[in-house]
Every structure is written in C-alpha cells, then in structure tokens.
C-alpha cells in the first residue's frame, strides 16, 4: 500500500504536464510508470536508500531522471515528494 502526500500528487501532476507539453504519449507513460514505481515502493518500502543525513525516516528511489522521496509507514509507504534528481531536494526537506 502506498499513499501520496499532497506535495507528491502535485509534483507528479506538474512533471507529467511539463512532459505533455511536447510529448503527450511520453507523459502518459511517465505518469503510469511513476505510479507503478510508487506501488512497488508500497510493497517493498525498504527498497530505497535510507537518507538519515536529511531526515532519519526518509528513503529515496530513482525513477528515470527523477527521485521519489518517501517514508516507510505501517503497511507500506508514504510518498513525500517527486523531484528531479539534479535538484537540491535535501535542502527542502531538512528540518
């Protein structure tokens, strides 16, 4: 089981819309792939890399050029944000 935070929902939508501006079919594939990766994370929440240097509970898993940031919760995972791998996402999530 996985759930998306409002931020993660907005991130996925924004990325898909950006891709769709030039390549609608690619955007649909990306969106479907992102949700499938989130499902896998929900089934195996320890699959990603632990990120204690940012926050003790956070993990990350790459998806293409993007990084899915999540935390393990009872019964699965909560997707916190989806960001480009080259971004300084750590700075946004530090307490």
Model-derived features: positions:
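Conserved beta-strand segments that form the floor/walls of ligand-binding pockets within enzyme
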Residues: 3, 62, 78
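Short, hydrophobic secondary-structure boundary micro-motifs
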Residues: 28-29, 49-51, 91
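Short proline/glycine- and basic residue-enriched helix-capping loop/turn segments at helix->loop/beta transitions
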Residues: 42-43
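Basic/aromatic recognition patch in beta-strand/loop cores that engages polyanionic ligands
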Residues: 46-75
């Amino acid at each position: 089981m996985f759930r998306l935070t409002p931020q993660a929902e907005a991130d996925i939508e924004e990325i898909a819309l950006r891709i769709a501006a030039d390549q609608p079919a690619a955007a649909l594939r990306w969106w479907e792939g992102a949700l499938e990766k989130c499902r896998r994370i929900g089934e195996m929440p320890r699959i990603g890399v632990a990120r204690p240097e940012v926050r003790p509970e956070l993990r990350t898993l790459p998806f293409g050029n993007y990084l899915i940031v999540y935390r393990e919760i009872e019964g699965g995972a909560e997707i916190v944000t989806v960001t480009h791998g080259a971004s300084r996402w750590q700075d946004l999530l530090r307490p």
